[in-house]
Regions:
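Intrinsically disordered, low-complexity segments
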Residues: 8, 27, 492-493
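N-terminal catalytic cores of secreted or lumenal carbohydrate-active enzymes
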Residues: 56-247, 279
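Substrate-binding and catalytic surfaces of secreted/luminal carbohydrate-active proteins
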Residues: 40-69, 73-82, 195-197, 231-249, ...
Length: 505
């Protein structure tokens, strides 16, 4: 009898132990599902894009943190280690996005059904999509502007048949109705959206030669023209505000060192731009209590450093100028660091870059976009990253005399309204979906031509690491914060975003 009681007691204890083990396993499993590892630390969330279509900003299994074992570290000395140093801080980010050109707005408003447009805007601007947070648009016509029938159209906000209009009596934003409508739809999804406006040209009657094309500069023989152009910017900002579209920033001239006879353009040298800012535009914004930022240059990396230094080197112009903008088509992003180092209190911005049919393929495109723009621009102090057209049709249009093989962030088929998300969508999404406006760039180890990185601390405290393997072979690497590490492997020409709560060590 006693033996039977002992046996039952032993069996009961075994059942209790088994139950405890089972409960512990369940708790561990639940913790893992909820982003916790067995040490009580949050796991790392990961999203991956590769040349394989199966991975397009696709969430991966959570990655656990581990204590960094010195013996293991010595044994794997050949493994790249990315150090995250949250206490070393750089610039504050304003956002990531693209441009709503006239062509983009036309396709969204006239090439899709209302349901298709809603889905696209949700994919672009809400938390369920990639949460773009910064938009550039053209003040008047550009190389991507069309009329109500989708035909090429060149115009400004103050066109007159003959003579001058110094009082801007013919000022009207009516021809940008599609753009305004799309911006309103975006703002309903993201009220914190930042919007930047850029003209391709002044009204022809203000220009020497009075042509919308050919890049003729402002008529310097008539001082009234400079004042009228400053007032033109004021009227534009006020008119868009009256439509419920606030303008946070303006650049003075798109690509001021490039002119063409194919679409609206205008030359503006650095000395002339400084003069216009300090004598006319800056005072005009101030008189009208407008806080819109003035951004200088807005052209390529290769010549931007000297142009920006000329404008910012003028003390009066500098007092009105918020920062400098750059494009990607020539030069290297290090030009932005050059300007930052010369004027560290003046932000730099990456405001235009277009993909296109000239590119070799998805993997190479992704690798370049990540290296030069998504990672390279912020590592060189840019406070935003913007692609060019947010949407184009399958032929790279509709165009107004510009590039015939450029590509939008998405492609809209106007015959069906179907949307194709291009490599630019996934590249910008690796940042915009996770790095919120107000995030601060923090220090991270960077291996050029291999595992390239940029890291941030969001306003809510979460940490984000964006990494790209720009090399030709698969790479395994460790990420270390304090005495904790996690390990990851990236195929060649791939990108990943990692997000986690700060570690407690």
């Amino acid at each position: 009898m006693k033996k039977l009681q002992k046996q039952r007691r032993s069996d009961f204890l075994l059942l209790i132990v088994a139950a405890i083990i089972l409960i512990g396993a369940i708790l561990v499993s639940l913790a893992m599902q909820n982003g916790m590892n067995t040490a009580g630390e949050k796991n790392v969330s990961m999203w991956l894009t590769t040349p394989d279509p199966a991975n397009r900003l696709t969430q991966q299994a959570p990655i656990p943190w581990r204590i960094d074992d010195s013996n293991e570290a010595a044994a794997s000395a050949d493994t790249l280690t990315v150090e995250i140093r949250p206490n070393i801080r750089y610039q504050t980010m304003e956002g990531f996005g693209a441009a709503v050109s006239g062509s983009s707005a036309y396709l969204m408003n006239h090439g899709m059904s209302a349901n298709q447009r809603d889905q696209l805007l949700n994919d672009l601007f809400t938390a369920g999509g990639i949460q773009l947070s910064y938009i550039r648009h053209t003040i008047g016509a550009s190389d991507y502007s069309v009329d109500e029938q989708g035909q090429p159209s060149s115009y400004t906000y103050d066109d007159v048949a003959t003579g001058k209009d110094y009082e801007l009596n013919h000022f009207s934003i009516a021809k940008d109705r599609d753009v305004i409508d799309v911006l309103k739809q975006i703002l309903r999804r993201n009220q914190d959206l930042r919007i930047m406006g850029t003209p391709w040209t002044a009204p022809p009657w203000m220009k020497y030669g009075e042509q919308i094309y050919n890049g003729w500069y402002l008529d310097y023989t008539d001082p009234r023209v400079y004042q009228a152009y400053a007032d033109y910017f004021v009227r534009y900002i006020q008119a868009f505000a009256n439509e419920g579209v606030p303008i946070q920033a303006i650049s003075i001239q798109n690509e001021p060192e490039f002119t063409t006879s194919k679409y609206p353009s205008m030359s503006m040298g650095a000395v002339e731009q400084a003069k216009f800012i300090k004598q006319y535009l800056g005072p005009a914004l101030s008189r009208n209590d407008l806080s819109t930022h003035i951004i200088a240059f807005d052209h390529n990396w290769d010549t931007g450093s000297e142009y920006a230094k000329t404008v910012l080197g003028d003390e009066q112009a500098r007092s009105y100028t918020h920062g400098t903008a750059f494009h990607c088509y020539q030069g290297e992003p290090t030009a932005m660091t050059d300007v930052h180092d010369a004027f560290p209190d003046k932000p730099v911005y990456m405001t235009e870059c277009s993909g296109g049919a000239w590119s070799p393929g998805f993997g190479d495109d992704l690798s370049w976009d990540m290296s030069k723009l998504i990672i390279g621009a912020p590592r060189n102090w840019s406070q935003n990253v913007l692609f060019w057209n947010i949407a184009l049709d399958p032929s790279g249009g509709p165009t107004n005399g510009g590039c015939t093989n450029c590509r939008g962030v998405v492609t809209i088929d106007p015959l069906s309204g179907a949307v194709t998300k291009n490599v630019e969508y996934y590249a910008i999404g690796h940042a915009s979906k996770f790095v919120r406006p107000g995030a601060v760039r923090i220090d991270s180890t960077h291996y050029s031509g291999s595992i390239e990185t940029v890291a941030y601390r969001n306003p809510d405290g979460t940490l984000v690491l964006i990494a790209a393997n720009t090399g030709e072979n698969t790479k395994t690497f460790k990420v270390r914060q304090g005495n904790q590490v996690f390990k990851s492997t990236l195929p060649s020409k791939s990108a990943a975003t990692f997000q986690w709560e700060p570690t407690t060590s």
